[in-house]
Regions:
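Phosphate/pyrophosphate-binding loops at sites that engage ATP/ADP/AMP, CoA/4′-phosphopantetheine
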Residues: 64-77, 189, 232-236
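Short glycine/threonine-rich loop-to-helix capping motif typified by GTGT followed
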Residues: 85-102, 117-122, 151-162
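Extended, hydrophobic alpha-helical segments in both membrane/secreted and soluble proteins
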Residues: 60-68, 77-94, 127
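Conserved catalytic cysteine-centered active-site region
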Residues: 3, 37-44, 54-59, 63, ...
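Short nucleic-acid-contacting surface segments enriched for D/E, G, S/T with interspersed K/R
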Residues: 234-251
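Beta-strand/loop nucleic-acid-binding surfaces
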Residues: 222-239
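OB-fold/S1-family single-stranded nucleic acid-binding modules
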Residues: 253-258
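Condensing-enzyme catalytic core mediating Claisen C-C bond formation in acyl metabolism
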Residues: 1-55, 128-129, 136-137, 145-226
């Protein structure tokens, strides 16, 4: 529980966006100014079932690479990084796709377990904190990744206390993501036969005992199918033994047979 997002937190964050000319006219002290250097937006294949792999998030990779190119910097040169952290898997996927070590400091807010929601508003806290960080260390930059949906929508921003030499830049590498292959999905009735477990989750009852298995499997033709099982013994084994990659079978009703 302590690793996942906690929406029962009473917090607020805000920022004011305006031109440098307006900030000067309003008398905002120069050391309070923070400049967005670059931004990108893109999304994975919308339907999770169509994504080629559940362990890769190419839109994060393309979006992250592009925003760094636009900002003319690298993550090694950026001091302050905040990755969206609704669940541990989100941080792991983001870090993997961006080439960041999990040993690096990957949040400047403490993450969603401490910042709450709702939904993408967490990133307002991340941007506001990045602003405070670069104000205090104006020679440094901040990098923020925002995520929405089932690790579906991604936005990236690079921020600094000094203006970008060539002005703010924005782009979307969506065409690169859209060009990637999609996994075909075979209907349950047509998927009966041998398969290989690609991913699975074991749901537990109120007493904490395994109750239902839900799994994605890959068929011989490379397509994906979904199946379930109420075999509690198998569920218990799946909690203690890695089953990804193991051969199984599914019947015409979508039941997993080990």
């Amino acid at each position: 529980k302590l690793m996942n997002s906690n929406n029962d937190v009473d917090m607020a964050a805000a920022l004011i966006m305006c031109s440098a000319e307006k900030a000067q006219a309003l008398g905002v002290p120069r050391d309070k100014w923070v400049f967005p250097h670059a931004g990108t937006d893109c999304h994975e294949h919308n339907f999770v079932s169509h994504r080629h792999s559940f362990t890769d998030t190419p839109a994060i990779r393309f979006g992250g690479q592009r925003v760094l190119q636009l900002a003319d910097t690298t993550l090694d040169e950026i001091q302050f990084v905040d990755l969206y952290s609704c669940f541990p898997s989100a941080v792991q996927l983001g870090a993997h796709s961006l080439g960041l070590s999990l040993q690096r400091q990957l949040t400047i807010t403490g993450g969603l377990p401490f910042a709450g929601g709702p939904f993408n508003n967490y990133v307002m806290h991340a941007i506001a904190t990045a602003m405070e960080k670069v104000r205090s260390q104006p020679q440094e930059k901040g990098f923020v990744w925002a995520n929405g949906g089932y690790a579906t929508k991604h936005s990236f921003g690079v921020y600094g206390a000094t203006p970008p030499p060539n002005g703010f830049k924005h782009d979307s590498p969506q065409d690169q993501v859209d060009a990637l292959p999609k996994r075909e999905v075979t209907p349950t009735a047509d998927a009966a036969g041998p398969a290989t477990i690609e991913a699975y989750s074991v749901m537990h009852d109120r007493s904490g005992k395994p109750e239902t298995i839900r799994a994605a499997v890959l068929l011989a033709n490379g397509s994906r199918a979904w199946c379930v099982s109420n075999d509690t013994n198998l569920g218990a084994e799946m909690c203690t033994t890695e089953w990804v990659g193991k051969p199984v079978a599914i019947d015409a009703a979508g039941q997993l047979r080990a």
